[in-house]
Amino acid sequence: MGRRSFGFLYRSRDFLSKTPRERGRPSPAKLLKEFEVGDKVVIDVEPSIRRGMPHRRYQGKVGVVMGRRGEAYLVDIKLGGKTKHLIVLPVHLKKHSG
């Protein structure tokens, strides 16, 4: 028996699947969303775009936009008493409503 793989997409089968109605690429508006520094955002991974995708442990977490890195945003998230800095494309973010 070989050793079990624990890669980046480990245990993400349901998390990275879409319903038939949601299948396909996202709209251009979703790809080009804009956020301001200081905005609260929720990490909501878009499975059809792997580029700029955060790890699944951050799915559903709320963070604050701290700046830009090219097309992506620098997002700070509190996790386990520490602040994590993520570089995430806007297609994987949505505004926090709370």
From Swiss-Prot:
Keyword Transferase among record annotations: no
Span of the signal peptide: none
GO cellular component: cytosolic large ribosomal subunit
Swiss-Prot/TrEMBL GO biological process terms: translation
Coiled-coil residue spans: none
InterPro entries registered for this protein in UniProt: Ribosomal_eL21 (IPR001147), Ribosomal_eL21_arc (IPR022856), Ribosomal_eL21_CS (IPR018259), Ribosomal_eL21_sf (IPR036948), Translation_prot_SH3-like_sf (IPR008991)
Record's keyword annotation contains Ribonucleoprotein: yes
Domain of life: Archaea
Pfam family, one: Ribosomal_L21e
An MF annotation (GO) of this entry: structural constituent of ribosome
Record keywords: Ribonucleoprotein, Ribosomal protein
PANTHER family for this protein: 60S RIBOSOMAL PROTEIN L21
NCBIfam families, sorted: PRK04306.1
Family: Belongs to the eukaryotic ribosomal protein eL21 family.
Name used for this protein in its record: Large ribosomal subunit protein eL21
Organism encoding this protein: Korarchaeum cryptofilum (strain OPF8)
Lineage: Archaea, Thermoproteota, Candidatus Korarchaeia, Candidatus Korarchaeales, Candidatus Korarchaeaceae
